[in-house]
Amino acid sequence: MDIQLKKGILELVILKFLSSRDYYGYELNKDINEILQLNESTVYALLKKLIEKNLCIQYIKNSDNGPSRKYYQITTLGMQHLKNLEQE
């Protein structure tokens, strides 16, 4: 499979998950791995690129069960991009 096509599909999958709610990194990786077998570093690398493109943001939230967690949230631009990807 073409590498750019793969990246586009993975970007779509991550944005689709984030469109339903905010996720912290480990939780997102775990849920994605239920349908796709991905290396954990792949998900984090794509999240970083999505942040750089302003398609999602990262924020820190305190946890009742341990240390603070980094959460990811889709932006308005990310929602528009997701709609475009779904139409292709």
Predicted regions: what is each one?
Residues 2-44, 61:
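N-terminal helix-turn-helix DNA-binding core of bacterial DNA-binding proteins
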Residues 8-11, 52, 68-70:
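A generic structural signal for short beta-strands and their flanking turns/coil linkers
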Residues 20-23, 52-53, 77-79:
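Short, charged/polar surface micro-motifs in flexible loops or helix N-caps
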Residues 45, 49:
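Alpha-helical DNA-recognition elements
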Residues 51-59:
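A short, conserved structural fragment
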Residues 63-86:
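Basic, amphipathic "hinge/linker" alpha-helix immediately C-terminal to the N-terminal HTH DNA-binding motif
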